[in-house]
From Swiss-Prot:
It is found in: Endoplasmic reticulum membrane; Golgi apparatus membrane; Cell membrane. InterPro entries: Palmitoyltrfase_DHHC, PFA4/ZDH16/20/ERF2-like. Belongs to the DHHC palmitoyltransferase family. This is Palmitoyltransferase ZDHHC4. GO terms for molecular function: palmitoyltransferase activity; protein-cysteine S-palmitoyltransferase activity. The C-terminal di-lysine motif confers endoplasmic reticulum localization. One of its GO terms (cellular component) is plasma membrane. The active site is at 179 (s-palmitoyl cysteine intermediate). Interacts with CPT1A. It holds the Pfam family DHHC. It comes from Rattus norvegicus. It catalyses: L-cysteinyl-[protein] + hexadecanoyl-CoA = S-hexadecanoyl-L-cysteinyl-[protein] + CoA. The gene is Zdhhc4.
Amino acid sequence: MDFLVLFSFYLAFLLICVIMICIFTKSQRLKAVVLGGAQVCARVTPQCFQRAVQTLLHQLFHTRHPAFLALHLLLQGLVYAEYTYEVFSYCRELEFSLPCLLLPYVLLSVNLVFFTLTCSTNPGTITKTNVLLLLQVYEFDEVMFPKNSRCSTCDLRKPARSKHCRVCDRCVHRFDHHCVWVNNCIGAWNTGYFLIYLLTLTASAATIAILSAAFLLRLVAVSNLYQETYLDDLGRFQAVDTGFLIQHLFLAFPRIIFLLGFVIVLSLLLAGYLCFALYLAATNQTTNEWYRGDWAWCQHWPLVAWSPSAEPQIHQNIYSHGLWSNLQEVFIPATPSYKKKKR
């Protein structure tokens, strides 16, 4: 099986897995499948190996650990090293526009600034000194956020839209999610930084993908490879087709082809997640609220949820105040005075 077919299967498998996770993430089916697979594996693997894996997974996903942050920087460094070493040099020889070739470095500079801000900024840690103030920022919807609920770990009243992060072991104001890639929670005070970081990361991956593909296409055009012929396995001359051309380019520029494949997949994944993050920002939701929304409504209204004759109920998002105000709140966190203006 040639390289093109294998690479196509790899891309298709990866994208299908991501789509399946996105589709079933709000249901119990995926969890049941994962737990069932884990139980099957547990029966055939030694106890010592299971304990080692559990310890490793706990360290990586249930404690603040810089492993994913280091992996993020390593992958980003490798991508830019390959871009600088080969793609940039070859594109200069083919007389590409210099501003276009420098654009990935501009995006990298901006990305690193907002990456640092996302990592280092307090996401909105709730403490005894600020809990009374934060309790006044958002109204309680009495569905996902009951008025008198307390955090059993921090022993503090829980402001609306807050959540206790088990990884960081703290309650976070307007909690969105814990991001292992920045080793920090995403909350009220760093969501804006996170969005710009995600936007520039997506743009840099897409720009490198476009420039790498443009280099290969111009190389094919300059070399007139489509007009060449080759000998097949039966000794007959065949016109160069797309499959043969890709394999030829892979043999001639293997690192660039791998780079192109990686950044294409990365661009698609990041673009999908960026669209989701922008949707949440435009509707003034957090990832935590989006994930919990349907389940919280079903718990609060069991008769409505399970009665076949009842009309379907929709959980109203009381925190959305229009597109412009919602986006403004992402970059300028809401305050008690902000809430009063909206009344």
